């Protein structure tokens, strides 16, 4: 078992005592230098906010105080045995800031795994400039569900080609669901969700499973206050209270995760397309040293389904 903590080092709530202290003590104080505050605003000092959310105040990432704070917090928990950090909204902070943090954390915790939440842009450059280990592969996430939803596997083919390029410099964090997006079963249905999982588990990367997706949870993300509630439900008190239609999806997760573990070389495999149509693709994921491979066929012509074969052509799994 390995544990990552989620570090929200880009912003704090407006009620944070440090924000109140900063406004009271002024720009020359340590607290004043920690937060990103417009001290010259005509209406008086006004904190700058995160992505337009008036209740979220940004840290001043150009100042030493923010670097010191993040280093202190990260080391505090790494000293106590966690294995790494997920850096929330890492994309909203310049890579140079993360580099200053990482160069002080690495000597003390050389094996810590640092994952940055990055939505778009040059993933490889962000990793190189920040010094972190990996970022969230949103390009592949979008291509997986969109290609199934639109019956257009050319999009998946393009994304897999891009994915190969990223693997030359780092191993991305791959996923088909998380706490910020519409549930995969709501996007593509239960069968489509299992097909998406088959792709996730047969291409390179460090895959993540969002809780509830293994039970075909549904939920639509909405752009409003409380719009994340549907995709972040509480789990029932016991497994007996889970809906029965989640059982086959759970079984598919067990089988495909088992397949992934039996083929650990998939983490940095390279993928090539062998056959491509709008509704059918066959791709091959090969070990980096070329020693072995898996062939995966995705067929969307009727209900979405996937078939996985080993290098000899033997069927390992079929949806």
Where do the model's predicted regions map?
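Substrate-binding cleft of secreted/luminal carbohydrate-active enzymes
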Residues: 204-218
């Amino acid at each position: 078992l390995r544990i990552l903590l989620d570090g929200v080092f880009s912003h704090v709530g407006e009620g944070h005592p440090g924000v109140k202290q900063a406004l009271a003590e002024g720009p020359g104080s340590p607290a004043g230098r920690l937060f990103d505050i417009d001290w010259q605003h005509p209406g008086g000092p006004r904190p700058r906010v995160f992505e337009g959310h008036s209740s979220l105040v940004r840290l001043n990432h150009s100042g030493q105080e923010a670097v010191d704070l993040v280093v202190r917090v990260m080391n505090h928990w790494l000293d106590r045995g966690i294995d790494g950090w997920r850096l929330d909204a890492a994309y909203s902070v310049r890579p140079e800031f993360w580099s200053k943090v990482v160069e002080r954390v690495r000597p003390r915790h050389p094996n810590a795994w640092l994952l940055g939440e990055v939505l778009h842009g040059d993933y490889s450059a962000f990793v190189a400039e920040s010094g972190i280990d990996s970022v969230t592969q949103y390009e592949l996430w979008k291509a997986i569900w969109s290609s199934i939803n639109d019956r257009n596997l050319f999009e998946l083919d393009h994304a897999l080609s891009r994915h190969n390029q990223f693997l030359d410099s780092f191993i991305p964090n791959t996923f088909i669901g998380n706490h910020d997006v519409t549930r995969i079963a709501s996007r593509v249905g239960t069968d489509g969700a299992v097909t998406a999982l088959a792709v996730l588990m047969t291409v390179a990367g460090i895959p993540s499973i969002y809780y509830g997706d293994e039970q075909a949870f549904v939920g639509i993300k909405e752009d409003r206050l409380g719009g994340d509630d549907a995709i972040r439900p509480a789990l029932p008190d016991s497994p007996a209270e889970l809906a029965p239609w989640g059982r086959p999806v759970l079984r598919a997760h067990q089988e495909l995760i088992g397949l992934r573990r039996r083929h650990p070389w998939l983490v940095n495999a390279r993928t090539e397309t062998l056959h491509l149509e709008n509704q059918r693709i066959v791709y091959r994921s090969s070990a980096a040293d070329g020693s072995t491979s898996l062939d995966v066929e995705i067929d969307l012509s009727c209900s979405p389904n996937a078939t996985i074969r080993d290098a000899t052509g033997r069927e390992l799994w079929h949806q």
